[in-house]
From Swiss-Prot:
Regions that span the bilayer: none
Transit peptide, residues from-to: 1-74
Gene name of the encoded protein: AGPL3
Protein name, as recorded: Glucose-1-phosphate adenylyltransferase large subunit 3, chloroplastic/amyloplastic
Regulation of protein activity: Activated by 3'phosphoglycerate, inhibited by orthophosphate. Allosteric regulation.
Keyword Transit peptide recorded: yes
Length: 519
């Protein structure tokens, strides 16, 4: 997709022809546009990527085209470029994880596996590294053991070069005189460790704080967001995404004026309040096929603050408020320059079992809406040093197969098979997210378990599974049927090793489903 960028010519900047045709870099090729196209492109770029014009002075539209009418110009001014070394990222590790239960019964939300071999925490971490941001704080709270283990294995084991940066894990603690040790909200989580951040600022030239969530799937260059923040001289910048009618009430919704300044923020509105937050999203027609299907602009829970503004809000102005979205931001926009950055690429909030399942299944589509595969902006995860997957007479269609699996005469369709998974003969997996295993069982161990009437890790012979999430280290026996043929929407059967959420069967971590079981 080709974009046009608007650059202002300020002060003594001049337009002088340099050369024509295909010579020079894209940044040197400037094409004079008519006033209508400039106005359109200027508005789009201001709201999406932050390039701003001025009231006075010539306007030029940057394009990647090189044609006979293309005029190359050089200007005598420089933009104030954002420096990733002046940015510190804070990744919120989530609360109790009730929305993703039972996947969060023994782990924090950011530690939930996704895409076969990744964890949710890998998304913001990798986006930070790919954006050049290497000063990162991760705030953990409930069930954080596996999250801490993954962070240390992946990011603190020497595999990634931080140069002068660092990754610090900050676990919820209770200070003397405090009534509660747990984080009471997103803002309270940052406030609890404001002393750590302040101490860090004394030794590092940090000007901007990037607040991130640990339960979303997207690929973003955070420095484009920070650049708009700098260009607008904003106190706070919200990253926003267009959303449809069906899910709009799940998010904080925003309205902004023609300059990109946020003028209204409503947290999870319903009824007439929801209707009042509708906006004209036609300016996104360059990125979305039918913007009318997405009449709302939702806050992604990704924020950039000026350092001093954040400290003042948390320590003084709103010292008693606990949440950014529902409490602080709606008040702050009346007192501060709060800007919107519209992110029109793929973004999925992994807030429920249904959204988690759908996001994983979408990875199997051809072509997928989101790709983990990108050599320029890779996603990092724990190095496991596993051998390639071995398959024997299998039928596999539209599936993702992770490392170190053993597949024998099975059928896999529109499913994700996680690391170290074992599927035996005549078993069928369809529309299923199988997370895999933490360890291998040897052939001798498997034979012994079968001889004792027990179930090995993996999926047994002649088992049929559809519309299911199978958590780590689950043992599914032979001749099992998991299809939820009765269409049950909600059910709690922990004693039998499974739950049903939104019609999706969730097999628990370390659970055993005995031979012949029908779910």
């Amino acid at each position: 997709m080709q974009f046009s960028s608007v650059f202002p010519l300020e002060g003594k900047a001049c337009v002088s022809p340099i050369r024509r045709g295909g010579e020079g870099s894209a940044s040197d090729r400037l094409k004079i546009g008519d006033s209508s196209s400039i106005k359109h492109d200027r508005a789009v770029r201001r709201m999406c990527l932050g390039y701003r014009g001025t009231k006075n002075g010539a306007q030029c539209v940057l394009t990647s085209d090189a044609g006979p009418d293309t005029l190359h110009v050089r200007t005598s001014f420089r933009r104030n470029f954002a420096d990733p070394n002046e940015v510190a990222a804070v990744i919120l590790g989530g609360g109790t994880g009730t929305q993703l239960f039972p996947l969060t019964s023994t782990r924090a939300t950011p530690a939930v596996p996704i895409g076969g071999c990744y964890r949710l925490i890998d998304i913001p971490m990798s986006n930070c590294f790919n954006s050049g941001i290497n000063k990162i704080f991760i705030m953990t709270q409930f069930n954080s053991a596996s999250l801490n283990r993954h962070i240390h294995r992946t990011y603190l084991g020497g595999g990634i070069n931080f140069t002068d940066g660092s990754v610090e894990v900050l676990a919820a603690t209770q200070m003397p005189g405090e009534a509660a040790g747990w984080f009471q909200g997103t803002a309270d989580a940052v406030r609890k460790f404001i002393w750590v951040l302040e101490d860090y600022y004394k030794h590092k030239a940090i000007e901007h704080i990037l607040i991130l969530s640990g339960d979303q799937l997207y690929r973003m260059d955070y420095m484009e967001l920070v650049q708009k923040h700098v260009d607008d001289n904003a106190d706070i910048t919200l990253s926003c995404a267009p959303v449809g009618e069906s899910r709009a009430s799940d998010y904080g919704l925003v309205k902004f004026d023609s300059s990109g300044r946020v003028i209204q923020f409503s947290e999870k509105p319903k009824g007439t309040d929801l209707e009042a937050m509708k906006v004209d999203t036609s300016f996104l027609n360059f990125a979305i096929d039918d913007p009318t299907k997405f009449p709302y602009i939702a806050s992604m829970g990704v924020y950039v603050f000026k350092r001093d503004v954040l400290l003042n809000l948390l320590k003084s102005r709103y010292a008693e408020l606990h949440d950014f979205g529902s409490e602080i931001l709606p008040r702050a926009l009346h007192e501060h320059n709060v800007q919107a950055y519209v992110f029109a690429d793929y973004w999925e909030d992994i807030g429920t079992i249904r959204s988690f399942f759908d996001a994983n299944m979408a990875l199997c589509e051809q072509p997928p809406k989101f790709e983990f595969y990108d050599p320029k902006t890779p996603f990092f995860t724990s190095p496991r040093y596993l051998p390639p997957t071995k398959s024997d007479k299998c039928r596999i269609k539209d599936a993702i197969i992770s490392h170190g699996c053993f597949l024998r005469e099975c059928t896999i369709e529109h499913s994700i098979v996680g690391v170290r998974s074992r599927l035996n003969s005549a078993c069928e997996l369809k529309n299923t997210m199988m997370m895999g295993a933490d360890l291998y069982e040897t052939e001798d161990e498997i034979s012994r378990l079968l001889s004792e009437g027990k179930v090995p890790i993996g999926v047994g012979e002649n088992t049929k599974i559809n519309n299911c999430i199978i958590d780590m280290n689950a043992r599914v026996g032979r001749n099992v049927v998991i299809t939820n043929s009765e269409g049950v929407q909600e059910s709690d059967r922990p004693e039998e090793g499974y739950y049903i959420r939104s019609g999706i069967v969730v097999i628990l971590k370390n659970a055993t489903i005995k031979d012949g079981k029908v779910i």
